[in-house]
Amino acid sequence: MTPKSAALVDDLVSILKSVQTKRSAKGFLKKLFPQPNEDATPSSTHQAPPVRLAVTKLAGVETIADDTLFGIGKTIQRMSRLGMQSIIVPSMSTPTGLSACFASGKCASLAQVNELREQLRTQELSQLDRVSDILCQAGVLARPSYGTLYASNADGVSLEAQRLLLETLQNGYTSVIGNSVVNPGLCLTQITPDQVVLGVVRSFAQMKSNVSVERLIVIDEVGGMPCPRRSHGSSHVLINLAQEYVSLWPTLSPKHAENLQLVNSCLDLLPHSAAAIVTTPDAAVFNGSTRQSHPIIHNILTDRTVFSCSLPVDRSPETKTTLLRRGTPIYMYHGTDCLTNGSVSWDRIWYLLNDSFQRVFDMPRYLERIRHNLALVIVAGDYEGVAIITLEQPQTPGAAPVPYLDKLAVLQKVQGTSAIADFVFNAMCSVFSQEIVWRSRLDNPVNKWYFERSRGSLLSRSTPWRLFWTGYKSADQKRIQEYLDVIDSIQPTWIK
């Protein structure tokens, strides 16, 4: 077995250790070893294999130490073995030379343009050489693209050498590209590394070829977007841009806000399955022993974060990495009005529950049960996920109502990698932050997921249920008994 084959076997074994479900493992293996199209014509079978692409921005590259850059190169090499090719865009911390001229917006003669290009070679291209050399030392087939220029037009910056760059990727090379732009009138235009990254993503997204941009990676000393709920400046684990972008952006520092805006603009151009990773240079280093906890490699393997965003904060490790997805909007309907005013489609919820649980749900009997105590309905996207919370009255006289998670369901086709269950669970906990309870059968394969997110758990002595609860409120023995009374008294509403 060759060293490359042995490394690939190690990665495949890592999949089995790191994924939580067979569905996730099968999904990755399908990407790594795509099945041939049975309907393919003889001519189509000779086409180049599909290119799965990651576009990586190396921010402040001149401040990244050589050994750190070498470790990042090992990560890029591992990504390539896992079927993900890379385009690297190194960026300088401060605008110099040509970038400063671009910022002035002044027009120039052809001679001046050529002179400024020479300045670029001495300032910016030296970093292209450095990055390429170190990546090669790390085992990456890196190729600096000195002549890759971009065109500036009304739509922004676009890549002019698409086909050449695509051929480079198809041949297994990693392209390291610079940041120079001249518009058709030879008028120098301001350009930033973010515009270059966006231009590359836009160009490949619009390109009618066998290539898909699956990841945007931003390696920046500031790391992921900080989360106020997490200690010591730890980052958001996962951001649902469809739900959180507008409210999150104004709260961030200028650098974090720039990175968030770049990610949002790029993911808007890409398929819903694409994702972005924002992390630090140190976290991006691969040393061989960090495969299962490496934020980039783990995500390539599983489409997930290293740990879930819906875990209790005090049980989550510190992180400087944020995974971002276009995600899905979350809609909340409070109280019982949504039972009758048409704001919620109960027919679609019935279909969702049947699909998720693979059972037939008795919706008329269920609606009768909740018509006086429905507290909240949470709908994810186009009825891709749902949570139904009721307020249940314990048997103890004068006891406070118990918030009860009656139903949590996700369509089967989006289970596993979409994080919809996490988004819905987080939304629920944001409303019922003090306490909420739910129950599960002892043989439910989802119980591991429930254990990780609960503050406590207890077996019922009289029914086949396990009680779970979470929230900031500390539950004493009396309150826990009230929880048990609630879960024991509710009758299931399944037909079969």
Curated annotation (Swiss-Prot):
Record key words, sorted: Acyltransferase, Amino-acid biosynthesis, Mitochondrion, Transferase, Transit peptide
Keyword set includes DNA-binding: no
Boundaries of every N-acetyltransferase domain copy: 333-493
Gene: arg2
Transit peptide as UniProt keyword: yes
Primary residence: mitochondrion
Name under which the protein is recorded: Amino-acid acetyltransferase, mitochondrial
Family matches, as PANTHER family: AMINO-ACID ACETYLTRANSFERASE, MITOCHONDRIAL, N-ACETYLGLUTAMATE SYNTHASE
Catalysis performed (reactions): L-glutamate + acetyl-CoA = N-acetyl-L-glutamate + CoA + H(+)
Organism per entry: Schizosaccharomyces japonicus (strain yFS275 / FY16936)
GO cellular component terms attached to this protein's record: mitochondrial matrix
E.C. numbers: 2.3.1.1
Listed pathway(s): Amino-acid biosynthesis; L-arginine biosynthesis; N(2)-acetyl-L-ornithine from L-glutamate: step 1/4
Membership in a protein family: Belongs to the acetyltransferase family.
GO biological process: L-arginine biosynthetic process; ornithine biosynthetic process
Localization of this protein: Mitochondrion
